[in-house]
């Protein structure tokens, strides 16, 4: 997600980025990271069905719930539309497929000179969970060809209009 397209306020951008990271991190059963020395190059976060979520945290969960409530109060048009679209697409997907897990997050440092970090992370995950049915949700800011080249199929698409209140300095 490119949150900076929706939020101008640096504090809100930081707070929402933290929320998003905690949400994905605490729902993960698998996290694979790529490093060069101490520098993080990329990460894949996956939630596999029937696997423990070892990264749960009381305080991170409290933070997530607080931001969820703030979103529902201020940004209900955007959040609810997004969640509803994902729910509908998932229901459509599960009519034909039985997923074993979801890729919740995949990112590589765009400033690194090393190429192929995302592919390496996906390959390592596939090695660990070979033959499993995996899905992901993404937005129009992603690289669809990246996923399609690696065997993913685009099953559903929905246009979502984010109704944000312009009275709030975002």
Per-range role (PLM):
Residues 17-20, 46-53:
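A conserved beta-strand-loop-helix scaffold within acyl/acetyltransferase catalytic domains
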Residues 119-120, 140-163:
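Conserved active-site alpha-helix within GNAT-family acetyltransferase domains
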């Amino acid at each position: 997600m490119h949150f900076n397209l929706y939020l101008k306020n640096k504090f809100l951008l930081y707070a929402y980025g933290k929320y998003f990271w905690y949400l994905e991190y605490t729902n993960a059963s698998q996290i694979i990271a790529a490093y060069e020395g101490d520098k993080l190059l990329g990460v894949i976060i996956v939630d596999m069905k029937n696997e423990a979520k070892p990264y749960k945290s009381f305080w991170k969960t409290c933070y997530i719930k607080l931001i969820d409530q703030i979103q529902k109060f201020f940004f209900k048009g955007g959040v609810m539309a997004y969640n509803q679209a994902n729910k509908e697409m998932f229901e459509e997907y599960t009519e034909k497929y039985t997923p074993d897990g979801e890729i919740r997050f995949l990112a590589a440092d765009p400033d690194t000179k090393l190429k192929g970090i995302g592919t390496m992370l996906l390959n390592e995950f596939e090695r660990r969970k070979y033959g499993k049915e995996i899905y992901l949700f993404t937005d129009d800011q992603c690289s669809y060809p990246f996923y399609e080249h690696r065997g993913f199929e685009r099953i559903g698409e929905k246009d979502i209009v984010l109704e944000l209140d312009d009275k709030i300095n975002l």
